[in-house]
Amino acid sequence: MARGGMRVGEVLKLTPNDILDRKLILNDTKSGKEQELIFIPQKVADRLKEYVRATNIGSDKKIFPICYGAARAMVKKAGQLVGIRLRPHDLRRHAATFASRSNVPLEIISKVILRHSNLSTTQIYLGKVSDAEAIRWIENLYA
């Protein structure tokens, strides 16, 4: 979720059949489209494929056969281990913020990573800027 900007529900629906090279094929999407493609880093694709092989998951079975509550609890616990409050959707927000801070164009973040139909929805995700970050950008802009 943090690398691909996926929604927790999308992750929980994934099957081995949905993995195609460096892409994930999402069916029955929130947007109402029949299918959507998600581009993922090669390392993530490799780890997913390794996990599927190691656990001998059937091609039409869910890769992560847990409910939303269990996924939420896992993410929350991971956050507690590092001393932060963390929810599944925060990982999606992180993907957008990381891409933005890596100078990925807003249109790519919106249409490819988050798959929003409206750019203004993406801007809500990226609207929170710390004072330190604002000062750094202003200093660099007018240096």
Give residue ranges: language-model regions.
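Short, polar N-cap/turn motifs at the start of nucleic acid-interacting alpha helices
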Residues: 19-21, 85, 104-124
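Conserved beta-strand positions that form and line the central face of beta-propeller blades
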Residues: 23-25, 58, 63, 87-90, ...
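C-terminal catalytic core of Y-nucleophile DNA break-rejoin enzymes
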Residues: 31-50, 57-77
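Short pre-functional
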Residues: 1-7, 97-98
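Catalytic-site neighborhood detector that most strongly recognizes the C-terminal catalytic loop/helix
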Residues: 30-32, 113-139
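Extended non-membrane alpha-helical scaffolds
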Residues: 142-143
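Short, basic (Lys/Arg/His-rich) helix/loop patches that form interaction surfaces
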Residues: 57-61, 72-112, 131
